[in-house]
Amino acid sequence: MYKRQGEESGFKITPQQLENTINQSTKWFILNSPSNPTGSCYTKNELLELANVLKKYPHVNIMTDDLYEHLIYDNNEFHTFASIAPELKERTLTLNGVSKAYAMTGWRIGYAGGNASLIKAMGKLQSQSTSNPTSISQAAAVEALNGDNSFIAERAKVFKGRRDFLINELNSMNGITCRVPEGAFYVFPSCKGVIGKIDESNNKISNDEEFTTCLLYTSPSPRD
């Protein structure tokens, strides 16, 4: 079950919303922080409040996607769920990989930490569906994780500069607003202010899809 969030909540679920959503059929609570595509990042206190709710429901497991853990900006800090709620460790599956922080998307390497029986079952299923990642990908991932990681902070600084530029430009546009993301490398602007306006072709913009169509343009080739 998806629980929609908006700008007013920072695109983050509240403890009360989580509790109201859980029922006997709920199997997993899936959390992505920092988030794709909003860039929202949960604080330690926010995670603790969610953990307090989940303690009441032993039939619900927790899956956390920590792929953007190294891409955090300003004074925000990353906290993984299993570390701030160790009493829920046996019910928590932590997912991560080298795609984002290490710019290794094509190497297709991810990893997980969790209950031993669950990890074993995951390995059995994965080995029969996609076989195994290549040896060179595995060796490269080990080197990335164990090697000099100083470049990560340098890259995060570059991403922050791009974020700041985009936020400034987006918020200077009539009808567009965009909150400042705490992490990852996305911005998630709202185009509510342009709905109902007339585009350059004298057509009324009725929804977000029509607005994105207005943004498309054709770029001639150099030979033209």
Language-model regions: role of each:
Residues 1, 33-36:
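Flexible low-complexity scaffold tracts in large eukaryotic assembly proteins
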